[in-house]
Swiss-Prot record:
It comes from Mastigocladus laminosus. The gene is petG. Component of the cytochrome b6-f complex, which mediates electron transfer between photosystem II (PSII) and photosystem I (PSI), cyclic electron flow around PSI, and state transitions. PetG is required for either the stability or assembly of the cytochrome b6-f complex. This is Cytochrome b6-f complex subunit 5. InterPro entries: Cyt_6/f_cplx_su5, Cyt_6/f_cplx_su5_sf. It is found in: Cellular thylakoid membrane.
Amino acid sequence: MVEPLLDGLVLGLVFATLGGLFYAAYQQYKRPNELGG
């Protein structure tokens, strides 16, 4: 069956998206004065 492969692909996409969001938030939190905020 292809279900395990699809599950792995979905989990990979979800973790990649969450990782990107957390990374962007961390970058903005690390340098909050760059945007004048």
